[in-house]
Amino acid sequence: MKSSAVLKGLQMSPQKARLVADLVRGQPVGKALEILRFTTKKAALPIRKCLESAIANAENNEGADVDALVVEQIMIDGGAVLKRFAARAKGRGSRILKRTSHITVVVAEVY
């Protein structure tokens, strides 16, 4: 059985969030939560909350055994990009891109 959770519009670069997502992909959920709890990256907290939501969805909606769940998929996709202006020398300006991410976590029960 598969269950998923989605977090959209996270104000963080997808490239930075993927560094944390790669740590927990394919891990049992208990180990994945421990890894995220002790990871010092900013992306660890929203990914952990999304994983906890996927675990709760599996437990409450599907009746899955939490100890048998594995992080089957974790995808970090790019969201909307906010374009901002930064003043530069000699009256010029440059563009700052404020990137956002969409996180999708899929947990599956292994037998």
Swiss-Prot record:
Pfam families given in the database record: Ribosomal_L22
Keywords, comma-separated and alphabetical: Ribonucleoprotein, Ribosomal protein, RNA-binding, rRNA-binding
Summary of the function given for this chain in its UniProt record: This protein binds specifically to 23S rRNA; its binding is stimulated by other ribosomal proteins, e.g. L4, L17, and L20. It is important during the early stages of 50S assembly. It makes multiple contacts with different domains of the 23S rRNA in the assembled 50S subunit and ribosome.
Lineage: Bacteria, Pseudomonadati, Pseudomonadota, Acidithiobacillia, Acidithiobacillales
GO terms, biological process: translation
Organism: Acidithiobacillus ferrooxidans (strain ATCC 23270 / DSM 14882 / CIP 104768 / NCIMB 8455) (Ferrobacillus ferrooxidans (strain ATCC 23270))
Signal peptide extent: none
Subunit structure comment from the entry: Part of the 50S ribosomal subunit.
PANTHER family the record matches: CHLOROPLAST 50S RIBOSOMAL PROTEIN L22-RELATED, LARGE RIBOSOMAL SUBUNIT PROTEIN UL22M
GO molecular function, one term: rRNA binding
Entry protein name: Large ribosomal subunit protein uL22
Record family assignment: Belongs to the universal ribosomal protein uL22 family.
A GO cellular component entry from the record: cytosolic large ribosomal subunit
